[in-house]
Amino acid sequence: MTAKKTNELTSGRLSVQILLYSLPLIASNLLQVMFNMADVAVIGQFSGTAALGSVGSTTTLVNIFTGSLLGFGGGISVLAARYLGAHDWKDLHETTHTSLVLSLALGVFALALGQGFSPLFLRLLGTKPELLPGAVLYMRVYLLGMPGAALFNFGNAMFSAAGNTKKPLQYLTAAGILNIVLNLFFVIGLRWGVAGVAAASAISQTASGLLLLRALIVSGEEYGVTPAHIRLTRSKVSPLLWLCLPAALQNAVFYTSSLFVQAGVNSFDATMVAANAAAANADPLAYDVMAAFHTACASFVGQNYGAGNKERIRKSYHISLAYSFGVSACISALLLLFHRQFLGIFTSDPAVVQAGVTRLFVMGLSYPWSAFMDCTIAASRGLGKTMGPTVIVLLGSCVFRIIWVYTIFAYFGTIVSLYLLYIVSWFITAAFEIVMYRRYFHEQTSIFKKKPVVA
C-alpha cells in the first residue's frame, strides 16, 4: 500500500477531507432512498394496493435484518481503520479475512432465520391476515440477497476505512440501476408482483456484493482480499465481535422499538396514519445524509487513534458534528419552507397534507439535534468503545421511548405529545453519550506513548 493512501485520514486539512470523504457516502445513501422509493412506486402502480400493502408491512422486519448487517459492517470499518492508521499490516490482513468470514456467516444466518421464521415474525408485528401471504413471499425471496448484502457491507467497510468512499458508490449505483430494470421486467413483463420486486432486490444486492468483493481481490492493497487467505484468525474474532455485535444489536433493537411508536400513531384515525406515513418520508432524507458524517467520524477517529494523533481525533469529532448538525439544519429548513410541496409528492388529499404538516414541523425542528447523539456514538466506536454507547442508546432511544408511549403519550393523547419523544430522547441520550465519550477520549489517548489498544 502506498503511504499516500494509508495516511489519507491521518494528515491534511480535516475540514476538507471529511467533506470529500462524506460526499460519496451522502450520494450512496440518497441513491438507496430513491431506489427504495422506486420499488414502492413500481409495485404500487402495477400490482395493486394489496401487493403494496404486503411489501409495506415488511418494512420494519427488513430494517431489522439490513440494519444488523449495516451495524456489523460499521464495527469492521472501525477496527480496520485503526490498523491502517497504525500501519499494522499483519493485523489488518488477518482482520480483513476474518471479517469476510464473519460477515458471510451473519448473512447466511439472517437468510436461514428469515426463511424459517418470517411467518412468525410478521404475525408478531401485527401484519393483517389478508396481507400475510404476500408479505411472507416477499421476505423469503428478499432474504436470498442477505449473503450478498453482507458482502457489500464488508466491502464498503474496508474501502471506507481506507478513505475510499467512491468505489462502493460506483457499484451501488450500478446495482441500483439493475434493481430498477429488473423491477420493471419482473413486475410488468413477467407479472411476478411481490416476488418480482423481492427478486430484483436480492439479485442487485448479490451483484453489488460480488462486485465489491472482486474489487478488493484485485486491488493489490494491504486491506485487499487474498482468496487463499480467507479464514478465521482466532485472535481477531473476539475484537471484531466486541465491536460489531453491539452495533448490530443496537440497530435491530432500535427498529424494533419503532413498533411501539407506530402503535401510538395507529390509535388515531386513518387520515392521521396516512399523514404520518407521508411525512415520515422526510426521515431518511435527514438521517441518511447525517449518517455519512457519522461514518466519517468513526473512520477518521479510528485511523487517527491508530496513528496516535490526539489532536486530530478531537478535531475529527468536532468537525464531523458541525457538518452533521449544519447540513441537517439546512434540510430541516427546506422541509419547513416547502412542507406542503413535499407532502404533495406522496398524497393529493388536503386533509392528509394538513395532518402531515404537524409531524413535519415537529421532526423538522428535531432532526439536527440527533447529531449530538449519533456523532458522539460514532466517535466512541472509533476509539474502540462500543458496549457502553450501545447500552446508553438502547436505554435512551429505545426503552425511554417505549416508556414515553405508555406514560406521557397515554396521558396527553395528542399526536404532538407522541412526536416529541424523539427530540427528548435524543437530548437525554446525547447528554450521557457526550459524558461517556469525554471519559473514553481521555482514557484512550493517555496510552499514546504505548501502542494503541485494539481489543
What kind of feature is each model-predicted range?
Residues 52-112, 149-168, 275-338, 370-393, ...:
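Small-residue-rich hydrophobic transmembrane alpha-helices
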Residues 25-78, 142-149, 238-304, 324-331, ...:
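Transmembrane helix-bundle signature of multi-pass secondary active exporters and lipid flippases
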Residues 73, 142-160, 168-176, 197-212, ...:
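Short runs within selected transmembrane alpha-helices of multi-pass transporters and secretion channels
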Residues 34-37, 46-49, 83-86, 161-162, ...:
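Helix-loop interface residues and adjacent transmembrane-helix termini in multi-pass membrane transporters
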Residues 64-67, 179-183, 209-213, 285-288, ...:
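Hydrophobic transmembrane alpha-helices of multi-pass small-molecule transporters
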Residues 23, 39, 76, 117-118, ...:
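Hydrophobic/aromatic residues in alpha-helical transmembrane segments
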Residues 1-22, 80-147, 189-245, 301-366, ...:
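Short alpha-helical transmembrane segments in multi-pass integral membrane proteins
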